[in-house]
């Protein structure tokens, strides 16, 4: 009588080979992440993301005009293959000027596969929320501050009169605001640039 097992050495070897090949295919996507962007490169990307935000989201200019501070993290790359992770670098703008640089890191587990790029804009509407963010050593969305995430879809307008939250967030891609996304668990940490 012969007993067969589900995990033979050949199957385990094939699994490792498959994971290795997928990692090799995905690695070029993150080559720019491994090389941290310069302050100038971040500033250029932030300007592009802000312009796209103003053009794609009706009411965006009002939000920006009333903001105490704006955190812009452009080109956040998210990769998932069972385990997922994302990374991006951006700038905090106060009074129309960049005052600090930040990165964001998040991880997740579950059914996910693929690569996605997105832009994150977090608008601090109250000075106390901005101060708490700037004073933190590593600020987590949903833990250190609650973010009202606007995800009404591309072409939608945002009513700034009825939205009274200290921190408002937007996630958008190439086609406008993205829906069904979250900032929960995303960590934002100040960079030295």
Give the ranges of each region predicted by the language model.
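Small-residue-enriched, tightly packed secondary-structure blocks
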Residues: 36-193
């Amino acid at each position: 009588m012969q007993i067969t097992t589900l995990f033979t050495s050949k199957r385990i070897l094939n699994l490792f080979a498959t994971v290795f090949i997928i990692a090799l295919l995905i690695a070029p996507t993150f080559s720019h992440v491994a090389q941290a962007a310069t302050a100038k490169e971040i500033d250029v990307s932030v300007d592009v993301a802000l312009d796209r935000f103003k053009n794609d989201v009706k009411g965006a200019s009002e939000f920006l005009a009333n903001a105490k501070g704006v955190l812009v993290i452009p080109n956040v790359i998210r990769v998932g293959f069972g385990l997922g992770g994302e990374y991006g670098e951006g700038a905090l703008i106060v009074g129309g000027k960049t005052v600090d640089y930040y990165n964001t890191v998040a991880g997740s587990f579950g059914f996910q596969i693929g690569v996605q790029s997105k832009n994150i804009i977090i608008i601090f509407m109250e000075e106390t929320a901005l101060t708490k963010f700037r004073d933190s050593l590593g600020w987590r969305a949903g833990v250190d501050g609650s973010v009202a995430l606007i995800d009404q879809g591309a072409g939608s307008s945002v009513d700034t009169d009825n939205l009274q939250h200290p921190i408002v967030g937007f996630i958008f891609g190439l086609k406008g605001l993205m829906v069904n996304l979250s900032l929960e668990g995303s960590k934002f940490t100040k960079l030295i640039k």
